[in-house]
Amino acid sequence: MQLVVARIGRAHGIKGEVTVEVRTDEPELRLGPGAVLATDPASTGPLTIESGRVHSGRLLLRFAGVHDRTGAEALRNTLLIADVDPDERPEDEDEYYDHQLIDLDVVTEDGTEVGRITEISHLPTQDLFVVERPDGSEVYVPFVSEIVTGIDLDAQRAVIDPPPGLIDDRAEIASARDAGAEDAGDEA
């Protein structure tokens, strides 16, 4: 099975290093020197990691055969993909690989069907489930414990407790100040 472990960002310097957006909790295992990674698009790989270092809180990698800024820039936005055992699980029981979550049914705590997870969107602040609703529309569900209250891989479902307005049109006013501002606007 293949697992996306990183996305290549901008070139760093003139000697072929690139910044990397890490998408694995085990970068030392998956992104170490000598690791051979498949790529998406496939035409840019496979890539062999020659060296890696952390600079200003960012992981920088250099790949075999890429020795200048031009070569590094050509790799920008390439996904790095590692082969993993399909039965491998993350060490933390509350962590999941994307492939484990794709195609899970999403229901609310009261059992109401929301849809099916079609994609995991990895953003800088949090991950999002992209959920396809029965009518074909999409809803984005933040993958945070306050909203995603349970994942049952055996039952193939994710249980959510969405705040009003996340999956419907029943948004509530966030604060009393906002409520006061709306009331004042009604008087004008």
UniProtKB/Swiss-Prot annotation:
PRC barrel domain span: 93-166
HAMAP family registered for this protein in UniProt: Ribosome_mat_RimM (MF_00014)
Protein name: Ribosome maturation factor RimM
Domain remark from Swiss-Prot or TrEMBL: The PRC barrel domain binds ribosomal protein uS19.
Subunit annotation: Binds ribosomal protein uS19.
Classification via SUPFAM superfamilies: PRC-barrel domain, Translation proteins
Keywords: Chaperone, Cytoplasm, Ribosome biogenesis, rRNA processing
Summary of the function given for this chain in its UniProt record: An accessory protein needed during the final step in the assembly of 30S ribosomal subunit, possibly for assembly of the head region. Essential for efficient processing of 16S rRNA. May be needed both before and after RbfA during the maturation of 16S rRNA. It has affinity for free ribosomal 30S subunits but not for 70S ribosomes.
Keyword rRNA processing carried by entry: yes
Keyword rRNA processing: yes
Disulfides per UniProt: none
GO BP annotations, alphabetical order: ribosomal small subunit biogenesis; rRNA processing
Species of provenance: Streptomyces lividans
Subcellular location per the Swiss-Prot or TrEMBL entry: Cytoplasm
Family to which this protein belongs: Belongs to the RimM family.
InterPro entries given in the database record: PRC_barrel-like_sf, PRC_RimM, RimM, RimM_N, RimM_N_sf, Transl_B-barrel_sf
GO cellular component, one term: cytoplasm
Molecular function GO labels: ribosome binding
